[in-house]
C-alpha cells in the first residue's frame, strides 16, 4: 500500500519497530496491531509481532516495514495514527483514534 494508508504509522513508531525487529534478529517479523473486547472502556488495543500474514489481513508498508491489521480491527482503526512516545513517565506506543468516543486514563482502551 502507499503512504496514503487510512491507518498512519509515524516515523517514530517505525523507528521503534525497526529497533525491536533488529533486537529479535528476525527480518520476517511484522507488527500486528489489533483491537479486541476488554479493558475498562469496552475495547482495547494490542500489539504483537507475527511472521505470518493471514489471507484477509490488511498489509500496510512504511519505511521498509510491514504492519498487519485483521479485518475486524481495521474498521475500528481507520483514520488512526499510531505513534511511539518517550517521556518521563515511560515509553509506549500510542494510538490516536478519531473513532474512539471515550478512552480510559491509560489510553489503552476505548469505546465507540
UniProtKB/Swiss-Prot annotation:
PROSITE patterns: HESB (PS01152). Binds 1 iron-sulfur cluster per subunit. Keywords: Iron, Iron-sulfur, Metal-binding. One of its GO terms (molecular function) is 2 iron, 2 sulfur cluster binding. It holds the Pfam family Fe-S_biosyn. Its cofactor is iron-sulfur cluster. InterPro entries: FeS_biogenesis, FeS_cluster_insertion, FeS_cluster_insertion_CS, FeS_cluster_insertion_RrpA, HesB-like_dom_sf. Gene3D superfamilies: HesB-like domain. Iron-sulfur cluster binds at residues 40, 104, 106. It comes from the Bacteria. GO terms for biological process: iron-sulfur cluster assembly. Homodimer. Belongs to the HesB/IscA family. Required for insertion of 4Fe-4S clusters. This is Putative iron-sulfur cluster insertion protein ErpA.
